[in-house]
Amino acid sequence: MWRAGRAALACEVCQSLVKHSSGVQRNVPLQKLHLVSRSIYRSHHPALKLQRPQLRTSFQQFSSLTNLSLHKLKLSPTKYGYQPRRNFWPARLAARLLKLRYIILGSAVGGGYTAKKTFDEWKDMIPDLSDYKWIVPDFIWEIDEYIDLEKIRKALPSSEDLANFAPDLDKIAESLSLLKDFFTAGTPGETAFRATDHGSESDKHYRKVSDKEKIDQLQEELLHTQLKYQRILERLEKENKELRKLVLQKDDKGIHHRKLKKSLIDMYSEVLDVLSDYDASYNTQDHLPRVVVVGDQSAGKTSVLEMIAQARIFPRGSGEMMTRSPVKVTLSEGPHHVALFKDSSREFDLTKEEDLAALRHEIELRMRKNVKEGCTVSPETISLNVKGPGLQRMVLVDLPGVINTVTSGMAPDTKETIFSISKAYMQNPNAIILCIQDGSVDAERSIVTDLVSQMDPHGRRTIFVLTKVDLAEKNVASPSRIQQIIEGKLFPMKALGYFAVVTGKGNSSESIEAIREYEEEFFQNSKLLKTSMLKAHQVTTRNLSLAVSDCFWKMVRESVEQQADSFKATRFNLETEWKNNYPRLRELDRNELFEKAKNEILDEVISLSQVTPKHWEEILQQSLWERVSTHVIENIYLPAAQTMNSGTFNTTVDIKLKQWTDKQLPNKAVEVAWETLQDEFSRFMTEPKGKEHDDIFDKLKEAVKEESIKRHKWNDFAEDSLRVIQHNALEDRSISDKQQWDAAIYFMEEALQGRLKDTENAIENMIGPDWKKRWIYWKNRTQEQCVHNETKNELEKMLKVNDEHPAYLASDEITTVRKNLESRGVEVDPSLIKDTWHQVYRRHFLKTALNHCNLCRRGFYYYQRHFIDSELECNDVVLFWRIQRMLAITANTLRQQLTNTEVRRLEKNVKEVLEDFAEDGEKKVKLLTGKRVQLAEDLKKVREIQEKLDAFIEALHQEK
């Protein structure tokens, strides 16, 4: 016990000593400090200089488990025991800090290099999208100039607001730990997850296949999108061309327009373009010269043409058909090597690879656009102009390659179509046939040589070209075979000249310069030239180009004047026919007639806005009543009128009117308004305009009317607004003056008399002719009509006895009528009695209602004063006044919608339809027909061709 007391006293002494010596109270225990921080803390803290490093000293020295003496608590000598430790702690601290710095620096350098390497790998995996920049409109790249990012940044929420919406990560971690515990406990779901993991490996092949299908689908969608925008671009270019033509034709006073002089070959190319359209329209063929390039598929036609044009301008494929439609290439000399299409103003710089790729892509798109669905090739021609220094002036037509077998994916008639296209061009007696033959294949496999020999058996306009001579020299065992081909002894055909060319090593990425150098180098070192098997003027594409150009212009000078004379005769015949048949009419072609019809149609649409409001409301009110009168009388008035008191009548009417207004009435009103607008529009479009009316526009006007009506849709909010207006109108029961009362009675009488007339006709058809018609017109009743007549007479007797008989017959009354008829020898069925009763009672009721209507003429005073007179209750008059007022208000509302909105929307639809028809040439040909239109079209085309031919001939003579 005394030891424990001494130990406690010693602890208190130590604690007080430490507090007095330190002067600062610590909040953090020393054990919780870092190792380095603890050493610094010991060295600098004045209290710790007086203590041992071990804080458990008190416990160790004064515990009951030890027998150590108290003399160890002497404090004075202990302060010198820490002197060596105080001398070395800065060195240890510096060593540790330096080690930490190297670790951090090394990690940063290694991590940065790894991150850069990973980023470069990811960057290489991303495909190059620069080829598709042209798809994105230009304004996308300039969009940052129109967006104020500062305003957007201010509109975005602050980081504090976003932090409030952030998920609670602690809760998510807790949920994930629970899920982990759940699955690690061996739940049944573990098996399912493992099965899924094993199944994922088996699905890899399916994923690869599906990814390939997605890529193919995206490529197909991209192609369709390109074709769509290609059509839009062509339409805009066509409009731009027409506007440019109008601007050039406009003769402004005081402004001198300089006439641009065209080259001779450009003028000739324009003549061929016009003739091509004329030939396609009238299924004829002109006889003007052009160079027709024919050959077997993959024989090198396109390569020869590219060597002549000195540019890789055509799309290429390894063994597959790439030329799907004829391509007319007009070569002319110019300072810059450029290409442009006939219907486009864009120039492709053929010295730039980007423009060359764009040109090839454009040609491929145009070919696909020309090919109709279900076909592989098309006879429609693509016209391309190529200008450049050193080019020989001529016009060449590249045709699809002749094939021997139709492969899968081709249309069944592909072979015949290619033959017919080739024959159509080669049948021209002035066409120069450039026959391309692959020298690397056996001559016996040639298809085109037989076709050429049929079209030009004497060889007066055929030039034979043997391609791939380098491969032929390597593969052919006997070089004399090539000599036989060039001399025209091997093939069963004749030609003006024979040429041998080399069009490269088969690499599509080769440039024209590289191919030309390879060709010259080959022929310089070739055994064929060294052994005089080939002559120098028969080799290289340059010599071929010069020879073809000379032959082309020789043909042009010999045949162009004869062609011009034939068109002069055609023009004279057409003009004479027009003067004899249409002496007082101008020669308007289809486009001019369409513009004239367009103006007439727009004038007729504007006439809709001239219709008076009174006329609109009258026809709307009348049409609406004709549409709803049956429902009002049969389903509202007649059921309510069967009641015996005023309260039940009004209740029934209000319920049925409310149901009718909520469901059917607004829709019926809109339908009536739309039909009324159609009728008025049709009336203005079809009514004759007197002697000036031209029936040639009737089909066009009818088509425009139908298409405009089909596109027009009434405003969606019209029914909702009408429902409120009609409901409020039907809720009003207060007739303010005698004039409105009389108008309601007149409206009611007119409606009931119409129904009574229909009922009388139904009864007459049921019972047959009366005695007057039987005597005058010699008509007799049938047996059934006689039975109906006897039944009617019996039922009328019943009504005379009881004028207030209800609407339905009781079973005993039916039995009584049947027995009375049987007593007179008339057998009748109960259903026949009911049918006859319906018409008889309906006539009786309508006559009673009309008599009551006459009584109510003088009942306005009682109604206005609210007198209760059971003998004169005019609730039915009030009902018809409510209906009449609803019709008037609805007609007024619909008239406002028509004049303010719908007429303008219809006019807009008509303009859109006319614009669509103006762009659709087939539609105009279908709608504007007749001998007069066709004759005007022929005259216009022939005049244009003759004018261009005369201008070309004049320029040709000047060049001589």
Curated annotation (Swiss-Prot):
InterPro entries: Dynamin, Dynamin_GTPase, Dynamin_N, G_DYNAMIN_dom, OPA1_C, P-loop_NTPase. Residues 321-324 are annotated as: G2 motif. Residues 295-302 are annotated as: G1 motif. Keywords: Acetylation, Apoptosis, Coiled coil, Disulfide bond, GTP-binding, Hydrolase, Lipid-binding, Magnesium, Membrane, Metal-binding, Mitochondrion, Mitochondrion inner membrane, Nucleotide-binding, Transit peptide, Transmembrane, Transmembrane helix. The modification N6-acetyllysine is found at K228. Pfam families: Dynamin_N, OPA1_C. PROSITE patterns: G_DYNAMIN_2. Residues 114-770, 782-960 are mitochondrial intermembrane. Expressed in brain as well as retinal ganglion, starbust amacrine and horizontal cells of the retina. Absent from nerve fibers and photoreceptor cells of the retina. The record marks R194, A195 as: Cleavage at site S1. Its EC number is 3.6.5.5. Gene3D superfamilies: P-loop containing nucleotide triphosphate hydrolases. GTP binds at S298, G300, K301, T302, S303, G317, K468, D470, T503. It comes from the Eukaryota. Residues 771-781 dip into the membrane without crossing it. Residues 467-470 are annotated as: G4 motif. The chain crosses the membrane at residues 97-113. Residues 736-856 are annotated as: Paddle region. It is an enzyme of class 3 (hydrolase). The paddle region plays a major role in driving mitochondrial inner membrane fusion. It binds lipid membranes enriched in negatively charged phospholipids, such as cardiolipin, and promotes membrane tubulation. A conserved intramembrane region, named membrane insertion loop (MIL), within the paddle region inserts deeply into the bilayer, further stabilizing the interactions with cardiolipin-enriched membranes. OPA1 dimerization through the paddle domain promotes the helical assembly of a flexible OPA1 lattice on the membrane, driving mitochondrial fusion in cells. Dynamin-related GTPase that is essential for normal mitochondrial morphology by mediating fusion of the mitochondrial inner membranes, regulating cristae morphology and maintaining respiratory chain function. Exists in two forms: the transmembrane, long form (Dynamin-like GTPase OPA1, long form; L-OPA1), which is tethered to the inner mitochondrial membrane, and the short soluble form (Dynamin-like GTPase OPA1, short form; S-OPA1), which results from proteolytic cleavage and localizes in the intermembrane space. Belongs to the TRAFAC class dynamin-like GTPase superfamily. Dynamin/Fzo/YdjA family. Oligomeric complex consisting of membrane-bound and soluble forms of OPA1. Interacts with RCC1L; RCC1L acts as a guanine nucleotide exchange factor (GEF) for OPA1 by exchanging bound GDP for free GTP. Interacts with CHCHD3 and IMMT; these interactions occur preferentially with soluble OPA1 forms. Interacts with PRELID1. This is Dynamin-like GTPase OPA1, mitochondrial.
